[in-house]
Each structure stands twice: as C-alpha cells, then as structure tokens.
C-alpha cells in the first residue's frame, strides 16, 4: 500500500506482482491475503507469479534478483511463470501464472520481498 501511495499509483494500474512466494502454507496465504487487501478480493487483471519457483530462495540476494526479473518482465512484456504449481493451497486463488510464461501488456509491476525477522519491502516499477 505504501509503495503505491508513494508513487501516486492506484492499485488497478498494476498488472503484475512478482510475489515473494516461498511456497510455504503460512507464507503463501499471508501474501495472498495481503495482495487481496490492497488489490481486491479477486482482482481480474492482476497476474501474480513467483520467480523463486524457478531458482529457489537466494537469501540476501533474493530481493535484488527478483527486482531484476520484474524489470525484465516490464521490458519484455512477458510474465514469468510459477512453475510446479499444480494444487494451490486453499485460499490461494489468484492468477499465479502457472507453468508457462505469458505475454502481457504491462505498465506497472510490483516486487514483494520479505526477510527473516519480519522485514518486508515492496518496490513498484514502471515501464519506460
């Protein structure tokens, strides 16, 4: 919410979120609920994927690498998939772009990063 407010961007202007997506039951539902609290219960045009599904958790480098992937998504107008997503947990019902990358027209993309000990950060990128 703060990233959007600071940028002067409305939630409905964001087309893609590169989620932290650690594939843990508690973490995935918490992130899904946070996304829904800002973007609505079932945001129709919002794609959410986790680049972490393809590379694992890079610990201290995760936020930087995921930001680069988010920027490349805007440049290439292609959303990377969440691989190996066959049966999302109950309540995890967003468009997680399963298995296959998707072409998409995007102007804004958000990257979520959560750290050990409760540090959270989200950064909003705009296509230029």
Q: Locations of the language-model features?
A:
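Conserved "HGTGT" condensation-loop signature of ketosynthase/thiolase-family condensing enzymes
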Residues: 1-128
